[in-house]
């Protein structure tokens, strides 16, 4: 059974993002029930527009038992704190993206230790691939995308930008109550 409120939200989201015409033939996209979901399909060529989540990679970077966070310089959640993340470019691996984002957003070089997990939910437009890493060089600093970058003790974290940030940190510190042991393992 299709939930009309979900349908309305879906339609508004696509209208706001400008997806109204077929990328194949430029015909109009109209909502249809396809595979038991409301999807947009072309009225001229029957192309189906699948709204797929974008892959994003990030890193929980540690140094001296502290966690690197960046203060977001853009919406959503401007001014709140999160860890370095970014969209995975074609030709890049998730691991390369995580390392690149730490450098771009926080001015640090990171050696990845391991994959922590893959995160998403039903209303999310991204699939987030998160690594644990060790800061091997650089001093945290802000940039155009990040107002600030700092190291925080696990017990003294600022307000985080997203609910999933808390889940992800719980996964890290639940498995590794002492973040320094990750760093020692790496040396």
Task: Describe the residue ranges of each PLM region.
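Short glycine-enriched loop/turn motifs at secondary-structure junctions
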Residues: 82, 123, 143-145
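Short aromatic/basic micro-patch
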Residues: 82, 109, 151
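N-terminal leader/linker segments that precede catalytic domains of diphosphate-processing enzymes
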Residues: 1-76, 87-104, 108-137, 180-187
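A short local loop/turn or secondary-structure capping micro-motif enriched for an aromatic residue
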Residues: 76-79, 150
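NUDIX/MutT-family hydrolases
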Residues: 142-172
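C-terminal terminal-structure detector
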Residues: 175-177
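Conserved acetyl-CoA binding element of GNAT-fold acetyltransferases
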Residues: 80-86
């Amino acid at each position: 059974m299709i939930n009309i409120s979900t349908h309305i939200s879906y339609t508004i989201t696509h209208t706001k993002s400008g997806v109204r015409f077929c990328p194949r033939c430029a015909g109009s996209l109209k909502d249809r029930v396809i595979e038991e979901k409301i999807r947009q399909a072309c009225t001229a060529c029957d192309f189906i527009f699948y709204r797929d989540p974008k892959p994003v990679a990030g890193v929980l970077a540690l140094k001296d038992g502290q966690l690197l966070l960046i203060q977001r310089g853009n919406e959503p959640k401007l001014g709140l704190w999160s860890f370095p993340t970014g969209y995975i470019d074609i030709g890049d691996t998730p691991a390369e993206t995580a390392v690149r984002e730490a450098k771009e957003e926080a001015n640090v070089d990171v050696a990845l230790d391991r994959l922590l997990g893959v995160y998403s939910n039903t209303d999310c437009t991204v699939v987030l691939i998160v690594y644990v890493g060790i800061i091997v060089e650089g001093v945290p600093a802000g940039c155009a995308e990040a107002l600030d970058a700092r190291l925080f003790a696990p017990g003294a974290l600022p307000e985080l930008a997203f609910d999933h940030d808390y889940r992800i940190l719980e996964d890290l510190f639940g498995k590794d109550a002492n973040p320094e042991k990750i760093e020692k393992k790496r040396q």
